[in-house]
């Protein structure tokens, strides 16, 4: 969404009550059980740019978040996440997804091993600088890169070629993560 309405531009994201009340009041039925859906307050919408997410500003889905102003011609991904778990995301767990470092998007990256080069080429072709998880490499049926993944993955993170993001929804074993439309 590109914003250009001057009245809307003056709005601060102080209290996004609609998102919070919709999340808090929601229930979902799963396998015959009714579950309360709680907002995951630490997962926010964010400003985005072409082939780049997380460009600086966030849009909270619960009260008390960051108070930033939207500027004209900025683009945002407004995401409202809810969970049947405890309603928070623990980000110091094992890595859940990766992104290629945007600053290196157009640079030739010197890698010594052929499998590492092949893995990076696969990432460039299929994901560029957008987020992906390791199982998506499996789904591409690129089994020849599985050893490179295991052996070279953390080396690529350590060399700042890939950024790693960790996290897990906290709660019951069978949590549901819902991306709610409000």
From Swiss-Prot:
Keyword vocabulary terms for this entry: Aminopeptidase, Cobalt, Hydrolase, Protease
Record carries keyword Lyase: no
GO molecular function, one term: aminopeptidase activity
GO biological process, one term: proteolysis
Annotated region (Disordered), positions in chain: 1-33
Cellular-component GO terms for this entry: cytoplasm
Domain of life: Eukaryota
Matching InterPro entries: Creatinase/aminopeptidase-like, Met_Aminopeptidase_Type2, WH-like_DNA-bd_sf, WH_DNA-bd_sf
Polar residues compositional bias, start-end: 1-23
Family classification: Belongs to the peptidase M24 family.
Name of the protein in its database record: Putative uncharacterized protein T27A8.3
Species annotation: Caenorhabditis elegans
């Amino acid at each position: 969404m590109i914003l250009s309405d001057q009245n809307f531009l003056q709005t601060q994201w102080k209290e996004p009550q609609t998102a919070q009340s919709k999340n808090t009041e929601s229930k979902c039925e799963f396998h015959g059980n009714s579950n309360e859906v709680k907002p995951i307050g630490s997962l926010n919408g964010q400003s985005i740019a072409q082939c780049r997410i997380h460009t600086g500003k966030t849009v909270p889905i619960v009260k008390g978040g960051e108070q930033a102003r939207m500027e004209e011609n900025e683009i945002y991904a407004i995401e409202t996440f809810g969970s049947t778990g405890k309603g928070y995301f623990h980000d110091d767990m094992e890595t859940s997804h990766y992104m290629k470092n945007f600053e290196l998007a157009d640079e030739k990256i010197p890698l010594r091993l052929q499998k590492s080069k092949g893995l990076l080429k696969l990432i460039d072709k299929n994901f560029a600088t957008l987020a992906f998880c390791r199982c998506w490499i499996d789904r591409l049926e690129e089994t020849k890169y599985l050893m490179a993944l295991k052996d070279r993955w953390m080396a690529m993170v350590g060399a700042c070629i890939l950024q790693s993001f960790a996290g897990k929804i906290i709660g019951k074993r069978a949590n549901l993560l819902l991306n709610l439309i409000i």
